[in-house]
């Protein structure tokens, strides 16, 4: 919403009222940022990156264009760079991403906006992932839409303009960029661990059961071998009224039993994890193996 209001204000608002929109937009972005830890992890999962950190990028970029020099320092903030690179760290291979909460493992291909975000924060890994994904999406037929950019790319005229202005630069970068080296990552704000060893990539979830778009998945793991799924999180069903109702956890995809987690059934009673902040991982420790 903030990016779209700024676009409208920049084109239509009288010059004397523009500072009001700038001030409110800065406040809106601050409110958004307070829900992120310094590590930049998106608790909603990789599929929501395009609707969260990436739209924040456009809002910040617009502020920098409307008020030159005022907001430029934001791009050197570690938290902003961490938010930008989150999507790189969750990427496995091809169309696959580690997924938790209401997130599909097919989280969409990266594109021009991600490239521009990477350029702003000087992230070669993000620029590389975005450029290569975009080049692949343009060159390969894709009947299953595994590589196709997110549908949100098609509903905003400004995104089309960004693409038209930057596409040739993105494609040129894709031809020369070396693949980004995968790395291990621990996100303490949400409790997400990413480990890669040889052919294997592991994702593990600590944290709690009060995330945005929460599933009862504390302790769950996903595993990939040679870029293909081995142990999966099935993600979420098609959204319905029930998904965002008090009956949310009657849906099987939300329940702990469907997240590679144990279920206890003493005396015919079934015990599963419950939603809520108090239902959380305890005594979490990350070994030095991440630095190996």
Model-assigned labels for residue ranges:
Residues 1, 21-28, 41-55, 75-83, ...:
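Secondary-structure capping and boundary motifs in well-ordered enzyme cores
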Residues 219-284:
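Active-site rim segments in enzyme catalytic domains, especially the processed small/beta chain
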Residues 36, 64-67, 266, 270:
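Alpha-helix capping/termination and helix-coil
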Residues 1, 48-49, 213-218, 259-260:
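Histidine-centered active-site/metal-ligand motif
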Residues 1-47, 172-175:
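Active-site lining segments of carbohydrate-active enzymes
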Residues 12, 53-230, 288-292:
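Carbohydrate-active enzyme catalytic cores, enriched for enzymes
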Residues 37-45, 67-72, 210-211, 241, ...:
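Short helix/strand-bridging catalytic loops that position acidic/His residues to coordinate divalent metals
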């Amino acid at each position: 919403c903030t990016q779209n209001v700024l676009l409208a204000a920049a084109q239509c608002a009288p010059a004397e009222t523009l500072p009001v929109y700038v001030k409110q937009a800065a406040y809106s972005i601050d409110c958004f940022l307070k829900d992120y830890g310094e590590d930049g992890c998106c608790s909603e999962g990789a599929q929501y990156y395009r609707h969260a950190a990436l739209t924040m990028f456009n809002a910040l970029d617009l502020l920098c264009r409307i008020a030159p020099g005022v907001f430029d320092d934001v791009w050197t903030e570690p938290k902003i760079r961490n938010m930008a690179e989150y999507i790189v760290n969750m990427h496995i291979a091809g169309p696959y991403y580690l997924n938790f909460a209401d997130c599909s493992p097919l989280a969409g291909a990266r594109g021009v906006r991600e490239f521009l975000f990477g350029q702003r924060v000087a992230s070669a890994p993000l620029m590389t992932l975005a450029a290569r994904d975009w080049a692949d999406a343009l060159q390969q037929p894709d009947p299953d839409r595994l590589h196709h950019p997110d549908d949100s790319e098609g509903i905003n005229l400004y995104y089309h303009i960004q693409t038209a202005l930057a596409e040739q630069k993105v494609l040129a970068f894709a031809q020369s960029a070396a693949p980004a080296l995968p790395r291990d990552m621990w996100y303490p704000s949400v409790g997400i661990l990413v480990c890669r060893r040889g052919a294997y990539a592991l994702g593990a979830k600590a944290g709690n059961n009060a995330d945005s778009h929460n599933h009862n998945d504390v302790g769950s793991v996903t595993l990939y071998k040679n870029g293909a799924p081995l142990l999966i999180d099935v993600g979420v069903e098609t959204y319905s009224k029930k998904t965002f109702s008090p009956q949310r956890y009657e849906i099987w995809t939300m329940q702990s039993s469907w997240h590679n987690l144990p279920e206890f059934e003493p005396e015919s009673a079934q015990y599963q994890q419950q939603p809520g902040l108090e239902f959380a991982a305890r005594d979490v420790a990350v070994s030095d193996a991440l630095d190996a």
